[in-house]
Amino acid sequence: MWVSSMWWPVLFLCAAFGAVFGNEVTLPVSVKFGDGLLSFSKNTNGLFYTINEQDGLTVENSISTGESNVARNNQEYTLTECSTNEEACVEFIINDVNVILKKDLSNRASSVSHVVVNSSTDGVRIGACVELGDGVDWFGGPEAKYQLWPVQDAQWNYTAYYTKEDDAVAIAEPYWLSSQGTYLYVNPATSMFIDQNYLNEGSLCIYAENVTPYRERNYTSLEYWIGRYEDPRTAHEAAVEEFFAKPTDVPDERMIAQPVWSTWARYKIYVNDTIVRQYAQEILDNGFNHSQLEIDDFWETCYGSLTFNTSDEKFPDIKGLTDDLHDLGFRVTLWVHPFINVDCTEYYSIAESAGYFAKDVNGTILTTWWQGENASVIDFTNEAAVEWFTSRLTALQASAGIDSFKFDAGEASWAPEPAVLTGNVEESPSIYTYQFARALATFGNGIEVRTGWQTQDLAIFVRMLDKDTSWTFENGLPTLITTLLVMNLAGYGFVLPDMVGGNGYIDGVLVSTQYPSKELFIRWLQANTFMPSIQYSFVPWDYDNETVEICRTYTELHEAYAPTIIEAMNALVANGTPVNPPVWWLDPTNSEAYNISDEYLLGEVILVAPVVVEGAVTRDIFLPNGTWRDATYGTYDIYEGPTWIYDYPAPLEVLPYFVESSYWETLSAGSGAFLPSSSLTAIYTSAILALLIQLFN
Ligand SMILES: *[C@@H]1O[C@H](CO)[C@@H](O)[C@H](O)[C@H]1NC(C)=O
Ligand SMILES: *[C@@H]1O[C@H](CO)[C@@H](O)[C@H](O)[C@H]1NC(C)=O
Ligand SMILES: *[C@@H]1O[C@H](CO)[C@@H](O)[C@H](O)[C@H]1NC(C)=O
Ligand SMILES: *[C@@H]1O[C@H](CO)[C@@H](O)[C@H](O)[C@H]1NC(C)=O
Ligand SMILES: *[C@@H]1O[C@H](CO)[C@@H](O)[C@H](O)[C@H]1NC(C)=O
Ligand SMILES: *[C@@H]1O[C@H](CO)[C@@H](O)[C@H](O)[C@H]1NC(C)=O
Ligand SMILES: *[C@@H]1O[C@H](CO)[C@@H](O)[C@H](O)[C@H]1NC(C)=O
Ligand SMILES: *[C@@H]1O[C@H](CO)[C@@H](O)[C@H](O)[C@H]1NC(C)=O
Ligand SMILES: *[C@@H]1O[C@H](CO)[C@@H](O)[C@H](O)[C@H]1NC(C)=O
Ligand SMILES: *[C@@H]1O[C@H](CO)[C@@H](O)[C@H](O)[C@H]1NC(C)=O
Ligand SMILES: *[C@@H]1O[C@H](CO)[C@@H](O)[C@H](O)[C@H]1NC(C)=O
């Protein structure tokens, strides 16, 4: 194990290419910058400057222009000192590339460097690379299909950093954090690309370049902050305070406590009145609770009509159906997407002639989505379009008895590119997502979206992008945890996990279905138990009675801990702290905690260690600093963390979890309502037996 407290990322910023560095420029060798050193070098790829920061937390000198280091014969170069008491600052211009470096000296416990590089030269690409470093773990970055945790081994091949369908980047906040307590935050209004482990192996590089999907601007700008703190938790708290909006409230509490039931994975597009009624009845007959029943794809006459198909084979009397479901105690929600297919002629032509579709620079409005080869997408940055869209939804709610909505898509990439959107050009195209989520959040805190960009303030659930029915890091069960952690680090703590067992797609074909195995289904639910909500589509009773019993148990356990989930959500509202943090959150200086990707916390009081490996019936568990009560088997044994428990027995029916000791005492002193009910005992009998066998072997 190699950890260096002296480690600090090296930045090289290369303003490369063409006109800028075509001329020979004589460079200064180095300039003192705060407590670090700024040095320049040049090679055939362009100009580089490097900031080498020493461990100088106590240094508070203002910037020296380092006159003695400046090559005076450089005509195209000027250096100015712009310091105040709070900031060390240096500005220099090389040809027309204007570089401003600022260093925050006001906070003695930290060191924040602020870098702005501006150029109005055409075709310029400005980059900054952070060396990921041996033995350093990195967290954050985008939501991704192949979701790792930590993320330093991820590969990104010079890719535009905005909300997009490709690689499942539905959340793209420009924020990374290292186990050394360093954060990198980039101005979201950047024509940003990232490259990791591709052009520069071992580095995370950010770039600004004015090419599609970004709109043309007459300058290129890269602005970022590097914050350095004693550990990742302190760094994250500082970053949240500085850059993230906190949610204004918590989402719908019934959606937290009781499962959402979606028709999607089980029925795909073959939904109708009969099927919905049958589904509802099965849920009740099997003794499960529900927050809502969601009617998913395909209920419309055509995609984008927002009109129920009232044929006999579909929904002949939707109001009658929702009335009956309401009588049974269900709320009814509806899948809605922002597209209109070209063959949905009546509605398409209204939106087209009114200019409601997102268009590219040439006025093209055609796009493609998973249920429409020829379609267009509503422009959510156009107020009139939003008004038209939302008023149709409101009318539909009234006429069809719909309580709330599941809003799909919403990533900026669905618009033809480069899209011409209303609003700040610098924020285009992700401003699409920003306005999408904001417009739809007006339907209340019982909605769900699946994308976010600078929308952490909204009191709504954000769903993980569709998960696949698999055991692998390629979008399978292990990524239920890693995606949870990444979303939380990006400030989105109201995570709606995708459906239990995944979507059951066969080879990515949306309308075919392959059930998850019993084992995968149960392990998936267990992993989901202490996440903010449970969403079913495949059902336990399609397996066997044991599955039903186990699933009922963990669904109940989730509900029993709903008050704890809400407490953690209130902490996010108040302080910006993650609802489901990684285990290092409670042990931020312990290097053993950093790379644990198969455990998570609920608030700071529950530690969850699900089995996510096929066939496994034991696992190793890391407990971070603190006193923990083993709640798994109801024995409440005490463990002092940090410690490892090796080969902890966890047969199929068992989810290992631990309760922080003082919280456990609070619960025990109370009504005990939070503690697992006695119905768990039966489930655990065989597990306890397994434990005994294990102990006596
Ligand atoms: C960079 O350029 C943009 C556009 O001209 C300007 O708005 C911004 O203030 C500049 N930043 C700095 C630090 O000069
Ligand atoms: C990145 O490039 C490498 C090498 O060309 C390739 O193997 C890999 O599939 C690419 N990854 C992505 C996500 O495009
Ligand atoms: C960019 O172009 C706009 C419009 O032509 C102009 O107002 C603005 O000053 C320009 N900005 C820069 C940094 O050149
Ligand atoms: C409604 O659904 C039925 C059955 O799938 C289909 O045949 C019919 O074309 C649809 N009706 C409309 C108006 O789209
Ligand atoms: C509803 O859909 C199911 C499955 O596709 C089908 O078997 C059934 O006939 C449909 N119900 C009606 C009333 O058409
Ligand atoms: C827009 O039209 C011009 C001229 O035909 C063409 O060169 C350009 O590629 C088009 N841009 C897009 C995004 O289609
Ligand atoms: C989409 O449009 C193209 C070009 O007009 C056409 O060839 C194709 O058949 C259309 N696809 C569908 C599903 O209608
Ligand atoms: C569950 O057990 C009941 C009897 O208690 C039996 O009727 C039913 O068929 C069983 N269901 C399954 C799915 O095994
Ligand atoms: C259903 O909800 C009730 C009341 O909140 C709760 O006591 C019960 O445990 C829940 N049952 C299941 C199977 O989740
Ligand atoms: C996690 O880090 C430890 C060192 O702290 C190392 O021994 C272990 O192999 C790492 N595990 C993984 C899965 O990378
Ligand atoms: C461990 O946690 C306790 C409080 O539970 C705290 O006082 C102590 O400083 C922590 N130790 C480390 C190494 O973080």
Predicted segments, located by residue:
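Cleavable N-terminal signal peptides of Sec/SRP-targeted secreted and luminal proteins
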Residues: 4-22, 681-696
